[in-house]
């Protein structure tokens, strides 16, 4: 069984361990935008080359 999420090649086991660096809350993977989303912080962290960039300065603010 393949433990990779199709888009972005994110390891599912890694996603289960990662939390938002600001809130320590859970993250959701948005495959369409290749981002990890923290609903609590209202931020989306980019995933580049399969590597999550967990820096608040690199995150996109969610204005929705």
UniProtKB/Swiss-Prot annotation:
UniProt xrefs under InterPro entries: Trm112-like
Gene3D superfamilies in alphabetical order: 2.20.25.10
GO cellular component assignments: cytosol
Pfam families reported for this sequence: Trm112p
SUPFAM superfamilies, A to Z: Trm112p-like (SSF158997)
HAMAP family reported for this sequence: UPF0434 (MF_01187)
The family this protein is said to belong to: Belongs to the UPF0434 family.
Name this polypeptide is given: UPF0434 protein BCAN_B0909
Highest classification ranks of the organism: Bacteria, Pseudomonadati, Pseudomonadota, Alphaproteobacteria, Hyphomicrobiales
